[in-house]
C-alpha cells in the first residue's frame, strides 16, 4: 500500500518529536527543515532566534514538488507541518489521488493546551513559537476537525492504546514501516 501520512497539530504538539523518536526522518518532508534550506535562523527584535516564515509560499511549492517526486517513486511519505489549512491539505489529497496513495492523518490536536505551551517552551530556541500564534492555530485546528481523510488520533503519551503489544511506536523502525502501515490499515482503513 502506498501511504501518505499527514501529521497535523499546533507547534510543539509533538509532530517532529514523533518523527525523530521513531527514526522516520528518511520518510519525512518537514516544512521547518525546508524553511531552514531557504534561510538561516535569524535574530528577532526581541533578541530571540527564529525560523523565518518569509518564504512560506516557496516552502510549500518545494514541499509539493518533493512530495510529487516521492509519489512518482512510490515512496511512503510523512508530511511534518501544522496542516491547519484546508488549502495545503487539498494539494496533498490531489496528489494522493493522482498517484493512488492512501492518505492518513495522524492528529496531534488532542494535546492539552497547557502541555502544548510547556512543550513549546522546552523546544530549541529557534523553534519556540509565540503563544498567540499557538492559540490561533489551536482555534484553526478546532474549527477544521474531521474535514478530510481517515484520521488517527494521536497522543504520544498513549501509544500503547493504539499499538497493543508491539512495544509502542518507539519500535516502528524495528518493526518496519510495513508493520506500521499494516496496523494503520487494519485499525483505520478497513472499517
Language-model regions, residue ranges each:
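Amphipathic alpha-helical transducer elements in NTP-driven molecular machines
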Residues: 53-64, 86, 131-138
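Conserved Walker B
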Residues: 34, 81-83
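Short, high-confidence coil segments that cap the C-terminus of an alpha-helix
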Residues: 2, 74-75, 101
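Surface-exposed alpha-helical segments enriched in charged/polar residues
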Residues: 65-68, 90-97, 139
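Conserved GTP-binding G-domain of TRAFAC-class P-loop NTPases and closely related GTPase folds
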Residues: 2-8, 13-17, 21-27, 98, ...
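Conserved substrate/cofactor phosphate-moiety recognition/catalytic segment
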Residues: 16-75, 114-117
Amino acid at each position: 500500500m502506498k501511504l501518505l501520512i499527514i501529521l497535523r497539530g499546533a507547534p510543539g504538539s509533538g509532530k517532529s518529536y514523533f518523527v525523530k523518536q521513531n527514526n522516520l526522518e528518511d520518510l519525512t518532508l518537514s516544512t521547518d527543515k525546508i524553511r531552514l534550506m531557504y534561510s538561516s535562523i535569524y535574530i528577532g527584535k526581541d533578541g530571540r532566534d527564529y525560523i523565518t516564515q518569509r518564504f512560506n509560499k516557496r516552502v510549500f511549492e518545494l514541499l509539493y514538488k518533493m512530495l510529487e517526486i516521492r509519489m512518482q517513486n512510490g515512496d511512503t511519505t510523512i508530511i511534518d507541518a501544522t496542516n491547519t489549512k484546508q488549502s495545503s491539505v487539498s494539494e496533498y489529497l490531489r496528489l494522493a489521488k493522482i498517484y493512488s496513495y492512501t492518505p492518513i492523518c495522524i492528529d496531534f490536536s488532542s494535546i492539552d493546551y497547557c502541555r502544548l505551551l510547556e512543550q513549546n517552551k522546552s523546544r530549541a530556541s529557534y523553534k519556540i513559537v509565540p503563544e498567540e500564534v499557538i492559540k490561533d492555530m489551536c482555534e484553526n485546528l478546532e474549527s477544521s476537525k474531521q474535514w478530510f481523510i481517515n484520521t488517527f488520533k494521536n497522543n504520544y503519551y498513549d501509544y500503547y492504546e493504539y499499538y497493543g503489544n508491539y512495544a509502542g511506536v518507539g519500535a516502528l523502525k524495528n518493526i518496519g514501516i510495513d508493520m506500521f502501515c499494516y496496523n494503520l490499515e487494519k485499525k483505520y482503513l478497513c472499517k
